[in-house]
Regions:
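Noncatalytic carbohydrate-binding groove/subsite architecture in carbohydrate-active enzymes
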Residues: 202-209, 347-348, 383-500, 532, ...
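Extracellular and organelle-lumenal recognition/adhesion modules and their flexible linkers in secreted
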Residues: 42-309, 326-328, 342, 388, ...
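C-terminal beta-strand-rich structural cap/linker in extracellular carbohydrate-active enzymes
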Residues: 624-650
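An active-site-proximal structural segment forming one wall of the substrate-binding cleft
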Residues: 196, 202, 222-242, 309, ...
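Active-site groove signature of glycoside hydrolases
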Residues: 208, 248-249, 354-385, 437, ...
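Aromatic/acidic polysaccharide-binding cleft in carbohydrate-active enzymes
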Residues: 81-82, 472-549, 553-571
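C-terminal motif of bacterial Sec signal peptides marking the signal peptidase cleavage site
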Residues: 15-16
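Carbohydrate-binding surface patches
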Residues: 565-600, 647
């Protein structure tokens, strides 16, 4: 996978400014070498002793600092086993259906066969099937995206006596590895390959020269990975700087057994995805199977036919460590039960217990935040029951989980659009109550579109205040645009920024926020293709706020009548000493605007993202976003069509 581009640092010495120095950094935050920023993203930001020319000088006024500290967890995010968020997004496995969930060449299997190939249910590792390849028989899978000058690590388990030839072939090259199999029991065989060319349509062919060679649990990953995760995705997520990650769902969790996702990955059984069972489609014929692309079918298709369980609880914890983020685990209160949830807390947070001893590491994970269920108010949710029954269920989960670790923080299922939240708060115990909202898109009116998430946030927060439960805080752990395409545009990022403004303004009640979702799926903060990862509009918004915003809400006002025909919003935050101010500005219009205030002593930094059009987004061919970081700018200038943060000394 491609290494994240490191922005080039350009230093400008300002003539006549003595020791003052301005540094500017530009980047498009894309790890694909196909992506190249537009010419202007590589230009030096203009700085000189004379103030930059602008379209409008706008005085701003600083209000009174709020007394409620902003919880950084409001800049959190959410990953779910849905679409290509995990598999082909975060996870680096390149072989689909590597554990033969369906018999080869049947159902949703991504394997075709040639010659004498049998499906073997006497499996070693990953039920329900292994595959027996007899003399001159072979199995094939298409769509392996090999990259230029890249190394890959592969392995498989096999038994029998003979030779297997593994070929990777495309229009440009063929790579072969001949491996002798000489074992009556299933044994792991490893190999390495090096690709000289870039070809997304490489096919893997596994052929036997003898009868009775049984194969199971194949794998191929780039040599550069982090515990099986895509390094390009993780490095981009690290730059996102989200402090809080929610997992594994989402609707997915209500049909998920966490115990399926621990232990040796090759022994974890592939399971039918219960939440989305039936949404997969079989292939009409072999030609259709062979014609399909890796990203469009099977477990990597929308929602997915099955869950390979390669990415589980331990992998999630490893990812959070890499990202220096707080993990939030959602337990299954749909088809799951309180004892399984109790076991999960025991696995994560205890030693010398039944499940603590099953943990990969001796030291406990000490997971603090636990959610009991997801959207259990909804008829679409597996295990949905009326509120009076769910109250009993929640209380049982709460009691069993707290028996293991009384220090954990519990997030309960809420919905204050109905009476659900009221009934939950009056009859259960929890530390936070969850709220989800998905705003309608308006493709005809950009201003309405940008403000729609903000309006949803205002509505939900106002409803929560009316419930008058001051000791239970809001966890807005899913929010996004409804029915959105994968790539998030600049205007979607602006909508996320305005939503974050509401979280900041209401820091006394909103303590957790999780944008949905992090990778791909519903307008992911970043998107991936076969060769790279790309930061998108809402990702830039989250990054800017997480990187720059300070501890307390500081109201900023201005004469709004000067900016009537666009979205122009300013929000301020200060540190506890009140000597530093961080402001975020959303400007959907075409004016370049300078903000002025006599209290502004020194501008420490300006960071912003912009594009030529509000509908721009990044893809694998062209990077349309332009992201800049600038130290010690000469004035507070807001570019057209931008999301900007400034840190200012007062």
């Amino acid at each position: 996978m491609k290494t994240l581009k490191i922005p080039v640092l350009i230093t400008l010495l300002l003539t006549g400014c003595g020791s003052n120095q301005v540094t500017s950094t530009s980047s498009n935050y894309s790890s694909s070498k196909n992506s190249s920023s537009t010419t202007s993203s590589n230009q030096i930001i203009s700085s000189s002793i004379e103030l930059e020319k602008v379209d409008l000088e706008l005085p701003v006024f600083i209000g009174t600092q709020s007394g409620f500290q902003i919880d950084r967890n409001i800049y959190g995010t959410f990953i779910e086993h849905i679409d290509t968020c995990i598999y082909n997004g975060i996870w680096s496995e390149m072989i689909m259906d590597r554990k033969f969930h369906d018999p080869v060449a049947t159902g949703v299997s991504q394997w075709s066969k040639n010659g004498d190939v049998e499906n073997n249910q006497e499996v070693y590792k990953s039920a329900p099937y292994a595959t027996t390849i007899n003399k001159d028989g072979s199995i094939t899978q298409l769509g392996i995206p090999l990259d230029e000058n890249k190394d890959y690590d592969g392995y498989f388990y096999a038994s029998g006596n003979g030779n297997l030839t593994i070929s990777f072939t495309n229009a440009d090259e063929t790579i072969e590895r001949k491996i002798e199999i000489n074992s009556d029991t299933m044994t792991k065989y490893e190999y390495k390959i090096h690709s000289n060319v870039k070809n997304r349509k490489t096919k893997i062919i596994i052929k036997s020269d003898s009868n009775g060679i049984v194969v199971d649990s194949l794998s191929l990953m780039p040599s550069e990975n982090y515990y099986g995760m895509r390094k390009d995705s993780l490095d981009l997520l690290k730059s996102l700087n989200a402090p809080f990650y929610r997992w594994p769902g989402g609707n997915f969790v209500s049909g998920y057994d966490w115990k399926d996702g621990i232990g040796d990955r090759d022994e974890r059984q592939s399971k039918r995805n219960l939440e989305y069972c039936g949404l997969e489609s079989d292939f009409e014929n072999e030609d259709e199977r062979l014609a399909n692309d890796i990203i469009k079918i099977g477990s990597l298709g929308f929602y997915g036919a099955f869950e390979p369980n390669d990415y589980g609880l331990d992998e999630f914890i490893m990812m959070c460590r890499y990202l220096n983020a707080e993990p939030n685990i959602v337990v299954n209160s749909g088809l799951g039960n309180a004892l399984d949830a109790q076991d999960e807390v025991e696995y994560c947070n205890t030693t010398n217990t039944e499940y603590g001893n099953k943990r990969v590491e001796k030291e406990p994970y000490n997971v603090k935040y636990w959610s009991i269920g997801n959207e259990m108010n909804g008829s679409w949710q597996l295990g949905n029951v009326p509120i009076n029954e769910y109250i009993v269920r929640h209380n049982e989960f709460y009691s069993k989980m707290k028996e293991v670790d009384n220090t954990i923080k519990i997030i309960g299922v809420g919905d204050n659009h109905s009476n659900w939240s009221k009934d939950m708060l009056n009859n259960t115990e929890m530390d936070y109550i969850s709220e989800h909202f998905y705003a309608e898109r308006d493709e005809k009116d950009s201003i309405t579109h940008i403000r729609s998430l903000q309006k949803q946030a205002e509505y939900r927060i106002d409803n929560h205040r009316k419930l008058n439960k001051p000791n239970v805080y809001m966890s807005i752990d899913e929010y996004a645009y409804m029915n959105a395409e994968c790539s998030s545009r600049l205007k979607d990022g602006m909508g996320v920024a305005l939503c974050l403004n509401e979280f900041i303004k209401n820091a006394d009640v909103v303590k957790i926020g999780c944008y949905s979702s992090t990778v791909n799926a519903t307008q992911g903060s970043l998107t991936t293709d076969k060769y790279g990862a790309h930061m998108q509009g809402n990702g830039y918004a989250l990054k800017l706020y997480s990187d720059s915003m300070l501890d307390y809400y500081q109201p900023i006002t201005f004469q709004r009548s000067k900016l009537k025909d666009e979205v122009f919003e300013i929000i301020g935050t200060t540190n506890i000493g009140k000597d530093k101010l961080a402001i975020a500005v959303v400007n959907s219009g075409e004016k370049k605007i300078r903000l002025t205030n006599d209290k502004f002593k020194k501008i420490e930094s300006r960071k912003y993202v912009t594009a030529d059009f509000l509908d721009d987004y990044d893809d694998d061919e062209y990077s349309k976003f332009r992201y800049y970081e600038e130290n010690n700018p000469s004035s507070i200038v807001v570019e057209p069509r931008s999301i900007t943060t400034f840190v200012i000394q007062l």
